[in-house]
Amino acid sequence: MLKSSVIAAQYWAFFTFFFIAVSICVFMLSISWILGGRSSSRYKNTPFESGIVPTNTTNMYCSVKFYLVAIYFVLFDVEALYLYAWSVSIVECGWIGFIEALIFILFLLSGLIYLISSKLLVWKSKNNIHVT
């Protein structure tokens, strides 16, 4: 048997899955293109808020600090999930698992120390003016 036919015989399920997934995507995109509306007017791209005409723009300033804190939260939360899974199976892991978890915690602490030392968790900026 040829090497390519052996590879095809081994991976037929993957190729079938890939073909079906691409076919479904192409089918859904083509159906939406065929059945979708083609009208264009000046009101087509305006936001619709319960029939009320918007009075100002929707652009608003949001500090990047909020996004950074959200990213840090997700990172440390996922790492906490890993630690929870480790703590549930601590009996099966033994000392090797304990040492691996200790190294993982040290990596977490080094990341937290980096965030604190680079002042990425400080909320006050130099330009803050407090009005009393």
UniProtKB/Swiss-Prot annotation:
Its main location: membrane. Its EC number is 7.1.1.-. The keyword Translocase applies. GO terms for molecular function: NADH dehydrogenase (ubiquinone) activity; NADH:ubiquinone reductase (non-electrogenic) activity; quinone binding. InterPro entries: NAD(P)H_OxRDtase_bac/plastid, NADH_UbQ/plastoQ_OxRdtase_su3, NDAH_ubi_oxred_su3_sf. GO terms for cellular component: NADH dehydrogenase complex; plasma membrane. The chain crosses the membrane at residues 14-34, 66-86, 96-116. It holds the Pfam family Oxidored_q4. It is a multi-pass membrane protein. It catalyses: a quinone + NADH + 5 H(+)(in) = a quinol + NAD(+) + 4 H(+)(out). It comes from the Bacteria. It is found in: Cell membrane. Keywords: Cell membrane, Membrane, NAD, Quinone, Translocase, Transmembrane, Transmembrane helix, Transport, Ubiquinone. It is an enzyme of class 7 (translocase). HAMAP family: NDH1_NuoA. NDH-1 shuttles electrons from NADH, via FMN and iron-sulfur (Fe-S) centers, to quinones in the respiratory chain. The immediate electron acceptor for the enzyme in this species is believed to be ubiquinone. Couples the redox reaction to proton translocation (for every two electrons transferred, four hydrogen ions are translocated across the cytoplasmic membrane), and thus conserves the redox energy in a proton gradient. Belongs to the complex I subunit 3 family. NDH-1 is composed of 13 different subunits. Subunits NuoA, H, J, K, L, M, N constitute the membrane sector of the complex. This is NADH-quinone oxidoreductase subunit A. The gene is nuoA.
